[in-house]
Amino acid sequence: MRVAAYPGTFDPPTIAHLAVAEAALVTCPVDRVELVLSRDPIGKSAPTPLHERLGAIDALRADRPWLSVAVTDHRLIADVCEGYDVVVMGADKWAQVLDPSYHESETHWHASLARLPLVAVARRGDVPIEPHALGGTVILLDVDLGEVSSSAVRAGRTDWRAL
């Protein structure tokens, strides 16, 4: 069984998260997409409590048997996706993965990039994507929901909520 890890805070899950997961299911192809929530995500301060985020994802998974959820204490994508066949992310997260400032050294950064499985990246507005950054192990997902964001949903934008 081929499984894709889709790391994120999903605070809350949006129509964009769901569209990216569905695109990964078909494009990669995989048998299952696992939403992987970090207990302490990089670059996110005070996310909604984990049990509330898990409850929202459980409701989302109810009629999607190919969608699962996992929780991790890892923070770096290379650690989160270890053991998976594919790692799925938006262009904004991909830009973060390619930023060496999130690592203790350039050597650590290069080692982390080398550990990544196949990477599936979804466009996100005008955020540039470097599809050749890992020498051909990056594929682009045919989905772009532009400005859809969890921040906007938390601020009251209900039509972007996945539930």
Language model segments and positions:
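Nucleotidyltransferase catalytic core that binds NTPs
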Residues: 1-163
